[in-house]
Amino acid sequence: MHASRTCGTRTPPASEGLSRRRAGRPFAAILDKTRITSAALEIIGRKGYDGLTMAGLAKQLEVAPSALYNHVTAKRDVLQLAEDHLISMVDVSLFGRAPWEEAARIWAWSYRDVFAQHTSLIPVIAVLPVTNAPQTLEMYETVTRAFAAAGFPQNLIVSSIVAFESFIFGSAYDVTAPDDIFEAGSTVDSTPHFRAALKAGRVNERPADTAFELGLEALIAALARSLC
Amino acid sequence: MHASRTCGTRTPPASEGLSRRRAGRPFAAILDKTRITSAALEIIGRKGYDGLTMAGLAKQLEVAPSALYNHVTAKRDVLQLAEDHLISMVDVSLFGRAPWEEAARIWAWSYRDVFAQHTSLIPVIAVLPVTNAPQTLEMYETVTRAFAAAGFPQNLIVSSIVAFESFIFGSAYDVTAPDDIFEAGSTVDSTPHFRAALKAGRVNERPADTAFELGLEALIAALARSLC
């Protein structure tokens, strides 16, 4: 199934050509979707997705914009390449080889971890059509097949996946929240219950993980019950 | 509890002063946090939060930047006003007056609906400290008190709220997703299971609501069981 894929491979190499330029004889690294994806992720990581422009991307790749347009026709295509590459890093390896709950657990944690590193892409991926995003479609196919085999009602499989993803995207943001996000400042006296709960919650060393595990296990348990 | 609050009221009036300007005698509407909040939300809705600048906000309010700085010291303050105002629109009215499951259900649906109208603020609210955001703190206090009264383990109350919020924020994006988000494009043949599940799911008229209900009820059911 993988052989025909030409983009979104798991580990795009760094843009070697940029550092291998030889004096007097410019070395033109072959421009392909892997290089475009790497450069786009680099720019998005630095400037957010609003900071990604076709002109900026061409400059980063040291090519003329026209060369870039031979591979991607618009920023939307570039975002889809970036999104599809990130999805290729999500672990779906246990689906079909372990009970679906266990596979879904590994999938969801790795999905959250990948997007916690790229939260600026969440507003994009959450609403970007998957058309021509082969790794993303493959992930959906793998998860769907496993959910169907487990006995999920057919008409609720896509909704279940979306519910997982919504929780995963929101939780990815939470990973990046500052430690003091719940500090109450000057209005502290009016929130005695909240303050007490915050204090009690300090036993959880990694609060984002505690909240994620709680919600994820809730989703898995409820879906497991719906199969009975 | 509400009397001392001076910002983030539930319904900020439109900036009347701007249309009541009288010829030859400029009418200066009183600049307060309510007007600043309205103007900020208007700009954010139009340009996203990256498009909000202190200079642009002063211009929108027809005041000198120095006048603006008398009320807010930085863009971060403005975002907090906007965030706190949105939170004031979330329905917490049933907490303490109905079973916690029912109150949480109304709270979560209204919370999702408010942020589905303002998804560009999600990356902000998800990581913005609540210091000096009185409506936000009041919401947390109300929910915490109800969860504690229901018998939630004290050390897991904040994590439970965060799990709900993560799901709510991710689901707010899903409300804005285009209908064709899962269209497979040219690679359609490699995803037979996913295509079949998509087709079966078309019985759900409002897919974002189906997914939200599924996940929300899962969270509520699992948390309810943890109380037994």
PLM features: residue spans?
Chain A
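Hydrophobic alpha-helical bundle segments that form small-molecule/ligand-binding pockets
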Residues: L137-V188, G201, L223-L227
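C-terminal all-alpha effector/ligand-binding and dimerization domain
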Residues: D209-C228
